């Protein structure tokens, strides 16, 4: 299950209590205080990792707790510190305070780690309170409670390429062709119900770093007002380096390619106007279903209405035009 939003209560460990104890040895009848300090409670940290793409493993949890510190002991022994709890999250995770909505941290890199809840300090044993005027203190202090925090985790996928388009535009078929995977494909809206990630290797380039591609669920008119799958997945578009609009040029589904592209761009800009500054390419898909003359006519009309856009013709089903798309990725995404 793809889980990209979750609320959790995080509870750091309590510090162990300090103890009152006395040194008891045969030749030291007045051995003095000998009670040790309590150990510190475990803290809760959050760390971003690669190869994790959802919060699925936390979906049935309401809270997470680090270990408490152990109490001190006689012989001036300090209690064991509680073990820290490290919460692993995907790159692209936003951490917010659930009570205030304040952004605590934006995790964008593998290995990025912060302390979210500090463990409580251990209490002091009676050895700590020994002074020149108080040689036999009977005081010890309890451990401090650990911090408790209610947090929200929200994922914005980080990918090189984001596939966006209307339901049934052929995104999933194209995704399968490019990533050599098997995302579910079907002839009904919203076949893709959650973002899918794949690695794109060009033929003969298997030893170079692949591109990460995200297949974003189908967008419909009104998505920016949360219709359809709406805002749940539009946010995953924000962090992609290249937006690949997949448009059904065949007209078989009674779509107008020009109208589809106009609505699609309008929805993205209504969601966040800054998306207009992203690198975009328009993939005119399903060309295998058109005669050459029909292709030329429809492409000419699109270029006339969208003169500033870059178009590429292809078929996710037959693979026609895919090599040219690989070359385009290479030119756009090379560092």
UniProtKB/Swiss-Prot annotation:
GO biological process: ribosome biogenesis
Pfam families: GTP1_OBG, MMR_HSR1
Essential cofactor(s): Mg(2+)
Keywords: Cytoplasm, GTP-binding, Hydrolase, Magnesium, Metal-binding, Nucleotide-binding
Keyword Magnesium carried by entry: yes
CDD domains, A to Z: Obg
Molecular-function annotations in GO: GTP binding; GTPase activity; magnesium ion binding
Enzyme class: hydrolase
Protein function: An essential GTPase which binds GTP, GDP and possibly (p)ppGpp with moderate affinity, with high nucleotide exchange rates and a fairly low GTP hydrolysis rate. Plays a role in control of the cell cycle, stress response, ribosome biogenesis and in those bacteria that undergo differentiation, in morphogenesis control.
Subunit structure as annotated in this protein's UniProt entry: Monomer.
Record HAMAP family: GTPase_Obg
This protein's name: GTPase Obg
Species assigned in the record: Chlamydia trachomatis serovar A (strain ATCC VR-571B / DSM 19440 / HAR-13)
This protein's encoding gene: obg
